[in-house]
Amino acid sequence: EDDGLIRKGELQDSTGGRKAQNYEFNPDHRTAIGVVMRSNELRLCAINLYGNVIEKRNDALPYRNTNVYYQRIGGIINNFAADVEKKHGKVLGVSFAIQGILSPDATTIIFGTIMGNTGLTLETISQSVHYPCMMIHDSDASAMAELWFDSTLTDAVCVYLERRPGGAVIAGGKLYQGPNQCNGAIEHMTLVPGGRECYCGQRGCMDTYCSPETLPEDYESIPGFFSVLEQGERHHRERMDEWLDYVAQAIVNARSIIAGDVIVGGEAAQHLEDSDI
């Protein structure tokens, strides 16, 4: 108790004498911080030892692959960590969820076309952070959260329908990244041979057909699209059905390799109805 590992819980019911004191595990004894860098935003969250989010912070901060940017986010992360430690427990470390493929030792971004940071190292990103740091592919981080909260998962394909879609593979109850840290890159599966050009240089990738960015019409936002869709507008329903066909084909293709559960997440997934699934 003096070390903070356990804390007093509720008193037990009396059986005639003084009520006995219960003790319980203190999940806030240690915490960890997750960081997501996006083109126009920096997102931070802190979790406790149960994996529950205990603090959040979002900053409108345009991404720049410069030392000045990494020094600035280092200050933001350190201040956030200090606030977390005041309210909760000591911060064990910081994990950066990366939109890109990492080197086998997870210290360098070897394919970072989305953010324009190929070759960026962990040392550079974390240069001003006062805590141990690591990098992980953002889809892999999401898959690890799935495993944390559902210990019954054995084999699964994770499909994350973000603006830049991604995927991950769970095999034997563990995240399976493969020797090159790039297993589960469903976003670069060819759906339409010779189709739309992808940022990776290929044509017809799943990304170019299953990104929610393909749904809105000119000058329409993604939330705006789904708002009109909910009103039953016919043209939006047709666009949605075509998009769902591509998503379904990607899932079918993936399940032909790994015949396990399918976990669908990401920004677009929150708008899907049971009938869509």
Regions inferred by a protein language model and the residue ranges of each:
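Short, acidic, Ser/Thr-enriched surface-loop or helix-capping motifs
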Residues: 48, 104, 170
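Hydrophobic "anchor" residues
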Residues: 53, 108-109, 175-176
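ATP-binding/phosphotransfer module of carbohydrate and carboxylate kinases, centering on a glycine-rich
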Residues: 1-9, 14-18, 22-60, 64-90, ...
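Glycine-rich phosphate-binding loop and adjoining helix at the ATP-binding site
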Residues: 57-155, 274-277
